[in-house]
């Protein structure tokens, strides 16, 4: 069996952990880097079902950190203690690739591979396409088609969009750096974000946190396959449903 630290070295080379935001907790979340692992599982999020199905001595690589904020208590009856208990009992290690991976891989996948936009410029966590000059309705139609969804929550502040900005996951707060006639495509848009953006003449399209990042596991699997690691992809449905 291989060691966790060997995979950490590969992942750090491709997406340095030092690139993560100061508030993030990417890296080894559970286990020891000197632990041996039996197989690798990649997933966007560690759900209770994924934890229960995880093989003994597995290494799980996840996008969202299981331990995000400092824990004052570890209660195995509530999240994340309920999942941590299962993982520890199975000797499962967990590596998180969060905002560092957003910057190096996932944002590009969201904007280019998934939504098919090119000519993108990096600006912090955002990718920006200047002088896109696209009609808002056509933009929404294109994104719905790319994501395979029938509806999207939007703020339409202008009919013609000059500049586009992309932030996978939860990036609605970043619209403040944009100019009027821009449109930010991201997830987790809140009511007050929408109100403020509208007052500034900035449009928003909520592509949802789930849909903007669901390609994570496949990207990681393809990367590790090139280093001769076999990876099992664990997918799950968006927990938020429109009924």
From Swiss-Prot:
An example Gene Ontology CC term for this record: cytoplasm
Enzyme Commission code: 3.5.4.16
Domain of life: Bacteria
Reaction catalyzed: GTP + H2O = 7,8-dihydroneopterin 3'-triphosphate + formate + H(+)
Thermal effects: Optimum temperature is about 35 degrees Celsius. Activity strongly decreases above this value.
Pathway: Cofactor biosynthesis; 7,8-dihydroneopterin triphosphate biosynthesis; 7,8-dihydroneopterin triphosphate from GTP: step 1/1
Swiss-Prot/TrEMBL keywords: GTP-binding, Hydrolase, Metal-binding, Nucleotide-binding
Positions with a binding annotation for a divalent metal cation 1: 63, 102, 213
UniProt-recorded Gene Ontology molecular function terms: GTP binding; GTP cyclohydrolase I activity; metal ion binding
Record's subunit section: Homohexamer.
Protein's UniProt name: GTP cyclohydrolase 1 type 2
């Amino acid at each position: 069996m291989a060691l966790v630290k060997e995979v950490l070295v590969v992942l750090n080379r491709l997406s340095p952990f030092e690139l993560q935001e100061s508030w993030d907790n990417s890296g080894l979340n559970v286990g020891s880097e000197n632990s041996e692992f039996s197989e690798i599982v990649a997933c966007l999020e560690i759900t209770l079902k994924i934890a229960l199905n995880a093989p003994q001595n597995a290494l799980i690589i996840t996008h969202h950190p299981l331990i995000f904020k400092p824990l004052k208590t570890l209660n195995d009856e509530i999240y994340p203690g309920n999942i941590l208990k299962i993982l520890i009992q199975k000797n499962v290690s967990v590596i998180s690739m969060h905002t560092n991976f957003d910057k190096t891989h996932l944002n590009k996948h969201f904007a280019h591979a998934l939504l098919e936009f090119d000519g993108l410029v990096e600006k912090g966590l955002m990718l920006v396409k200047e002088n896109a000059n696209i009609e808002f309705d056509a933009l929404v139609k294109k994104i719905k088609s790319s994501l395979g969804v029938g509806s999207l929550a939007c703020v339409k502040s202008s009919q013609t969009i000059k500049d586009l900005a992309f932030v996978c996951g939860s990036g609605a707060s970043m619209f403040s750096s944009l100019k009027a006639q821009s449109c930010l495509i991201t997830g987790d848009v809140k009511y007050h974000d929408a109100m403020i953006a509208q007052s500034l003449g900035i449009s928003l399209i909520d592509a949802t946190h789930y849909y903007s990042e669901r390609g994570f596991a496949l990207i990681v699997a393809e990367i590790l396959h090139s280093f001769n690691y076999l990876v099992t992809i664990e997918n799950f449905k968006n927990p938020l449903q429109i009924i």
